[in-house]
Amino acid sequence: LLVIAGDNLFGFDISEFIDHFKSYEDPTLAAYDVGDLEKAKSYGLIDVEGDEIVDFQEKPDDPKSTLVSIACYAFPADAIRFDEYLAGDNNPDEPGWFIQWLVDQGSVRPFSFDGIWYDIGTADSYLEAVEFALDGDNIVADDATVENSELGDNVHVLPGATIKNSTVEDTVVFQDASITDADVTNSVIDEEASVHDKDLDGSLLGQNSRVQ
C-alpha cells in the first residue's frame, strides 16, 4: 500500500522510494530534515538508528531533532493492521499516530532524502513552492488579460484571469479572477475572486470572494 499526502511537493523520484521499500519489505516512510526545531513541531518527528526508526513522535511540543516524516508511506500487506490499531482505542484521525504505533510493533524504515520538499497545505508554503518553481519568472496564460500593469517576480496568472492598472508580485491569480487598480503581493487569489481598488499583502482570497 502506497500512501502520499496530496499537499506534498518533493524532489525525489517516487520509484526510488518504492525500490527502497522493496529492499526491506517493512513499513517505510520518507524522511526530511527541516533544519528548524520550531518547524519540526508541526510534523511527525523521527529518531533513526542505522537503517531503522527507533522512535516516532507525532507533532511533539519539544522536538529534540529536525528529521520529520513527510507523509509518504509504503506498507507491506502484513502491516495494514488498521482493525487491530483502532481496536486499541488509538487516534483514528492522523496517519502519524498509526506510524508511531507501528514503530512499537516492529521494524519501520526511513527513506531519507535531500533536495526540495514543500508542505503546500498552507498559503505561505504554497507560495514558497511557487517561488521555487518559477525562479523569478512569470507565467501568464494565453487567454489571460494583463493591461497597464506591472508583474514582478514569481507571478502565475491562470486562464481567464484579468489584471488591469495594477502591480502584482509573488502571487498566484487563479482562473477567472480579477485584479483592478490594486497592488497585490505575496497572495493567492482564488477562482473568480476579485480585488478592486484595494492593496493586499500576504492574503488568501477564497473562491468568488470580493474585496473592494
Region roles according to the model:
Residues 1-50:
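Conserved beta-loop-beta/alpha segment of the NTase-like Rossmann-fold superfamily
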Residues 139-212:
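Structural signal for interior beta-strand "rungs" in well-ordered beta-sheet cores
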